[in-house]
Amino acid sequence: MTDYLLLFVGTVLVNNFVLVKFLGLCPFMGVSKKLESAIGMGMATTFVMTLATIFSWIIDHLILVPLELVYLRTMAFILVIAVVVQFTEMVVRKTSPALYRLLGIYLPLITTNCAVLGVALLSINLNHTFMQSALYGFSAAVGFSLVMVLFAAIRERLVVADVPLPFRGNAIALVTAGLMSLAFMGFSGLVKF
């Protein structure tokens, strides 16, 4: 049980995919202008990343490894991610049309989000069991969502702040992301792998 807790905390805080591994920066910068869209994107990414990691583990261990087709891992995982994203898009369109309109182009872009593919590949490369792989995917998604929501909240406050003209817009957003990354470096001694 302690191993699972350490895996969760380590993935969410210490080895955050956005601020430490620099994966998923496109949606991180693109969807974080409004808190509502960041929350929606975080929930959609959490759903997709968790399911994609689980299905990728299953396909790898039941099909690719037994048939010695591990060289097709990346292509197979991209296909899994695309199917999960299409399923998520259909669910979001039916359950929350407002969220579907709010996410707009970013929902299909989850397919090309390098963080989703990176989590699936890293989970396999780290030789996780099924439960560890599922928890790793969920933890990475929670870390991604946490950072996106925090960043969106900060960016909303920066809109009304008195920011010097050369730093307005993306410049102050990048400075803020760098400061957040430094803040998350403080968690580096929390969990040792």
Curated annotation (Swiss-Prot):
EC number: 7.-.-.-
Cellular component GO terms, alphabetical: plasma membrane
Keyword set includes 4Fe-4S: no
Subcellular location per the Swiss-Prot or TrEMBL entry: Cell inner membrane
Keywords for this protein: Cell inner membrane, Cell membrane, Electron transport, Membrane, Translocase, Transmembrane, Transmembrane helix, Transport
Membrane topology: Multi-pass membrane protein
Principal location class: membrane
Xref: InterPro entries: Ion_transpt_RnfA/RsxA, NqrDE/RnfAE, NqrDE/RnfAE_oxidrdctase
Transmembrane segments: 5-25, 47-67, 72-92, 102-122, 134-154, 171-191
GO biological process, one term: electron transport chain
Matching Pfam families: Rnf-Nqr
Family matches, as HAMAP family: RsxA_RnfA
Assembly description: The complex is composed of six subunits: RnfA, RnfB, RnfC, RnfD, RnfE and RnfG.
Similarity section: Belongs to the NqrDE/RnfAE family.
Function: Part of a membrane-bound complex that couples electron transfer with translocation of ions across the membrane.
Name of this chain's protein: Ion-translocating oxidoreductase complex subunit A
Gene source species: Cronobacter sakazakii (strain ATCC BAA-894) (Enterobacter sakazakii)
Organism classification: Bacteria, Pseudomonadati, Pseudomonadota, Gammaproteobacteria, Enterobacterales
Gene label: rnfA
